[in-house]
Amino acid sequence: MSTPADYFTQLFFEVFESLPRQGPGSRNSAAQALSFCGELPSVPLILDLGCGSGSQTFHLAELTSGSIVALDTHGTSIERLRAASVSRGYGKRIRAVVGDMAKPDLPPDSFDLIWSEGAFYNIGIACALDVCRP
């Protein structure tokens, strides 16, 4: 028997999977949010949690010179992001991985910027803050 969370996930992807974005946002809103981040290294290491198929990941690649690790639980979205990264010329800067944003299997304090555009609500604020400040 599936849980309500399983049902929500299935329903979410039925509705949003084929769309270019799986949540709110735009290149302009990403640029504005980045302007509030303060000074980043010239080539920042960015973690994009809950990246979906990567619309905001590409905005980050366009707006920074950084290397981006894009993480999402949905394998189909990650495959789409991998293919699009290569076709758009970002294959060396974007590494798309399947993983759990509530428990990313990544070394703590290894990123200059943690980004999550319209996804953290899925794990709750307390968990999201724990991920950002381990």
Residue ranges and their predicted role:
Residues 23-42:
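Conserved alpha-helix/loop element of class I SAM-dependent methyltransferases that forms part
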Residues 1-14:
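N-terminal, positively charged/glycine-rich alpha-helical extensions of SAM-dependent methyltransferases
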Residues 12-24:
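Class I SAM-dependent methyltransferase Rossmann-like catalytic core
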Residues 47, 53-103:
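Class I SAM-dependent methyltransferase SAM/SAH-binding core
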